[in-house]
Amino acid sequence: MYLFFVRHFNDIDHLTPIAWKMHRAGQPVAVYCMNPRYDHQSDYRLHFLKNLGITVDYLHNRFDRHRGLLHELLSRLVEKSCEAQRLSETMRTDVPFYKKRLSYLIGKFGILSYKLIRFGYYDIRWAHSILERSGARAICFDHIMPGLYVVRNLLQAAKEKSIPSFSLPHGVHLYTDEAAKAKSTDARRASKFNEFDHIIVPNRLRKDLLVRSGVSAKKIVVLGSARYSSEWLAQNKKIMPRRIPASANPPSRLKVVFMPSKPQYHADLSRLSTTCNLLAGMKNMDVMIKPHTRTGGEKHLFKDNNLPDASSVLTAELCEWADIALVVGSSVITEVLMQKKPALYLKYLHANTTLFEELGACWTIHDESELEHALRSLQKNKAAVPYGETRVVEYVKQVVYGGRAEKDVLGNYENFITAHAGK
């Protein structure tokens, strides 16, 4: 059995295509969510896998067993706190403060309860039992810190049983400056990756960075992006739930989606606000904004900006809907370019450099005045962009296909994992 361990929206986005491909190739696959706070039953990608007959469950539900009254009590507290947390996320803004505060405190208490269970019950013996009961041949994670959830115990148990571990991409690295994120240090990267047997990265840019950080080059293989492979994009289009009504497609208006990056990536928050106000005032345009899915506690930065919040709309649907996409450092530019739509890179909103910028595969915008001029120009002619198709082709080759000439990305993932799996 090939075990895939997931935790959040983004890693599920990148691991689902691989699990799907392996299942189609006849490999036994199971997907387990390590995060009790994530509602995996409402995730359309995991629902899709489950309908194919793939086992999808919470890890602690699948492999837990009764260990006494204290364990049962703590487990119940975790379950109830997760329910309260999900409820608080859907509360209206006019809900009394005390109710929001109560849900928040229950959620925090649930986290504490989970940590107590993890410390007292989810130990190395439990990890061994998971591998034995599942008949694991390989364990696959995203690029996760081993100290999170029960990852380190699973890695140790797998090593003791000679079962290989794989660290798979949960995104696409596109920053060409190493200081793109303050806490991303060489020491942190080395400690994060060196505990895994095999590390798969989407592009050479990411491999070179990890090697410079002290990660063994022998462990790293470049296989491209499963999430943006043509095979998965076509499949995802068939299964994704759509939220944008047909009436939101007036042909006379320019449809624009703005997808900023996480604020932690040296974002200029003042100019971000100015840009939102500029977009809100543009005539004959429909503009939606979708904050990054990992924005987390900084979501308040995007409130009251006079733009419709598209957080509940999938990125893939927004790329379909929009005539033009505005991006900063997000890999979503890849899907935009593969759909042959204009991609405007708002360089002035952060202090980083990017691969698509250096390859000339986008329209680089240096200030608010240039942005307004570019949008006015595209209103007249949506195809009038200052970058050529050859630049886009080279970008897609490096980012999606890992620099390879052949394009069977998912097949390469399946072949590599099965070739290095245990017996």
Walk through the language-model features, giving the residues of each.
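A short alpha->beta transition loop at the rim of the catalytic pocket in nucleotide-sugar-dependent
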Residues: 162, 323, 340-342
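Active-site and donor-binding regions of nucleotide-sugar-utilizing enzymes
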Residues: 3-232, 333
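Acidic donor-binding loop of glycosyltransferase active sites
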Residues: 136-137, 317-328
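Catalytic binding pocket for nucleotide-activated donors in carbohydrate/polymer assembly enzymes
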Residues: 214-217, 222, 293, 301-306, ...
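Short beta-strand scaffold positions
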Residues: 141, 201, 326-327, 365
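C-terminal alpha-helical cap of glycosyltransferases
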Residues: 399-423
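Conserved catalytic-core segment of nucleotide-activated headgroup transferases in glycan assembly
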Residues: 227-301
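Short alpha-helix at the nucleotide-sugar/activated-sugar donor binding site of glycosyltransferases
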Residues: 159, 319, 337
